[in-house]
Amino acid sequence: MFKKVDKKASREKRHLRVRKKVFGTAERPRLSVFKSEKNIYAQVIDDINGVTLVAASSLEKDFAAKGGNKEGAKLVGELVAKKAIEKGIDVVVFDRGGYIYHGRIQELAQAAREAGLKF
């Protein structure tokens, strides 16, 4: 018989493997992404001090019906980049959170790059 693959557990294992290598500092913080079925979240984190510097999500007021789809991810990417640049952060390390670089994750990353973040 075939075992059923637990996708969430696989993603969490991938995320731990990636997190061993991806580390955010004050000069180059980590842009972390999390997605649920209905929403997408992004935050810029300084891992040395354990502080979230900037955060944006599709739950904010500007996102009426564009929650967790590609358009919503693009808006979240633009918003997190805009907030980061306002705080003087222009270079980050991208942490895809164990997700495949495809779809909503890719849209968020491309929008953040177009808005001025470098990674």
UniProtKB/Swiss-Prot annotation:
Keywords: Ribonucleoprotein, Ribosomal protein, RNA-binding, rRNA-binding
Similarity-based family: Belongs to the universal ribosomal protein uL18 family.
HAMAP family: Ribosomal_uL18_B
PANTHER family assigned: 39S RIBOSOMAL PROTEIN L18, MITOCHONDRIAL, LARGE RIBOSOMAL SUBUNIT PROTEIN UL18M
GO molecular function: 5S rRNA binding; structural constituent of ribosome
Species, as recorded: Clostridium beijerinckii (strain ATCC 51743 / NCIMB 8052)
Name of a matching Pfam family: Ribosomal_L18p
GO CC terms, sorted: cytosolic large ribosomal subunit
Role, per record: This is one of the proteins that bind and probably mediate the attachment of the 5S RNA into the large ribosomal subunit, where it forms part of the central protuberance.
Subunit and partners: Part of the 50S ribosomal subunit; part of the 5S rRNA/L5/L18/L25 subcomplex. Contacts the 5S and 23S rRNAs.
Protein name: Large ribosomal subunit protein uL18
Domain of life: Bacteria
Gene Ontology BP terms: translation
NCBIfam families (alphabetical): L18_bact
CDD domains assigned to the protein according to its UniProt record, in alphabetical order: Ribosomal_L18_L5e
